[in-house]
Amino acid sequence: MALALVTAAVGASGCGGDSQPPARAPADSRLLDVARASALTVTPGGGLLAGDLETGAILSSPPRATPLARLKVATGGQRGLLGLAADRRGHVYAAYTRRGDRRIVVDRIAPGAARRIWTGPRSADLANGGHLAIAPDGRLVIGIGDLQEPALIADPRAPNGKLLVLRTDASNRRPAILSSGWNNPFAFDFTPDGRLWVADNSPGRRPERLARGDLGGAPEDVSELMRKTAPSGIAAISSTELAICGFVTETLDRYRLNQGRWRFAGTIARGCRYGVVRISRGRLAFSTGRDIRTVAAR
């Protein structure tokens, strides 16, 4: 998962002198008080679901009397409640590290009783991934990091460093590989034109990438992030504009597609640490580590 990447933080102190356009006015609305909300998704009705990394509680806005669910998560390092997604039928899916063997699993948690969709690999202290998204064709996509075993990225039998497609109506013993070659693809989103863009974490001082992740092979159309960010979330504002949340920078940054490359285009808001999602009326909801706030996308 792309939270608190220890390796990504190495060398990040050199970014303080980067020149950049000033941030916009502070986010002007608080939606929910959720500490370390690492999983965000929007329901078909326009509501927001936010999952707490360490408690496994899933809260909603507009608020419910009780949490939608409280998952039994294993914690420590980058473990916990990792991802949420809601499809057009109103089914809600959660990815998390379960207690006991600490494997990454995906459940359908609503409506009705929870049902296991996929039992994945054992988690690691870092680079688990676990973000979920619904593809335009309705398929469920999960990103899995290298799990601190980068040598397995090249192994087609291992989930390490891959974006996987999970069926929601059948067994997922061998999920289809959407793309491979990632360090930790926790931050990804589909743009309105159907393309999947990934803001990939990278270890140490290696540059972080913003690249296509839906072409069936290695990352394509690769750009580099302007500074060491440790991306923890990405939201498509349009087909040519993205908002990227940075755990290290604690900013919500704008990137625009220009002549085939993504280029930094200023800071939308400060305080973003754990994720971002586009909500209704042209706004973004982002997690500060203390609460969920909103800001205008433009």
Task: Give residue spans per PLM region.
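Flexible internal linker/loop segments at domain or repeat junctions
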Residues: 216-230
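Acidic, Gly/Ser/Thr-rich repeat motifs that build Ca2+-stabilized beta-propeller blades
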Residues: 15-149, 187-189, 194-199, 207, ...
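Predominantly extracellular beta-rich ligand-binding scaffolds that present long acidic/polar faces
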Residues: 197, 204, 213
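Loop-centered beta-sheet repeat module
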Residues: 157-166, 173-198
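Secretory targeting and sorting signals
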Residues: 1-19
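Active-site rim elements
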Residues: 174-176, 221-225, 238-240
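Acidic/polar, solvent-exposed loop segments in beta-strand-rich repeat domains
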Residues: 148-158
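Beta-propeller blade signature
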Residues: 105-111, 156-168, 212-214
